[in-house]
């Protein structure tokens, strides 16, 4: 699986370009499904299924939130709901997530949303400054979901 490298300084112009150029093509080509998150009537971030493999029933989930929304449980709730949608409406069997090991809030999101940690991909992420970090692999399996 891959993960979305959204820079910390992500600006509205970046988001607008992404929505105009990449997101519609991914949906049309059946390679990704992008959703905007709204909280209290304001844009709060994005959630997606990417690296879709509809034939084998797999996808990777990703999310990011605006800074003012973090820590309110929005990502956990949205991740749980999109996962349920993936299992019940799309028919996925397995949904994966990769998180940089130092991203403790994101690790908590996945654990609280019901994902199981499956392993560590050592030195799998290269930061902008050239340092390498481990990635943590999580997954949700349809037959285990909701237990």
Model-derived regions: residue spans:
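Conserved GNAT-fold acetyl-CoA-binding loop/helix
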Residues: 1-21
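A short helix-loop-beta-strand connector motif used in the catalytic cores of GNAT acetyltransferases and
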Residues: 20-36
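Alpha-helix C-capping/helix-to-loop hinge sites
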Residues: 3-6, 22-25, 68, 124
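Acyl-donor (CoA/ACP) binding surface of acyl/acetyltransferases
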Residues: 34-147
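Short, conserved alpha-helical segments within structured domains
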Residues: 7-11, 33, 102
């Amino acid at each position: 699986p891959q993960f979305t490298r959204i820079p910390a300084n992500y600006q509205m112009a970046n988001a607008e370009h992404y929505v105009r150029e990449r997101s519609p093509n991914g949906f049309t080509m059946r390679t990704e499904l992008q959703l905007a998150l709204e909280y209290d009537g304001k844009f709060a971030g994005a959630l997606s299924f990417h690296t879709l493999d509809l034939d084998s029933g797999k996808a990777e989930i990703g999310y990011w939130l605006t800074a003012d929304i973090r820590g309110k449980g929005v990502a956990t709730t949205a991740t749980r709901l999109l996962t349920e949608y993936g299992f019940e409406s799309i028919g996925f069997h397995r949904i994966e997530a990769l998180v940089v090991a130092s991203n403790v809030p994101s690790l908590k999101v996945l654990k609280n949303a019901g994902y199981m940690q499956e392993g560590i991909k050592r030195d799998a992420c290269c930061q902008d400054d050239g340092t390498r970090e481990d990635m943590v692999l999580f997954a949700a399996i349809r037959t285990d979901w909701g237990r």
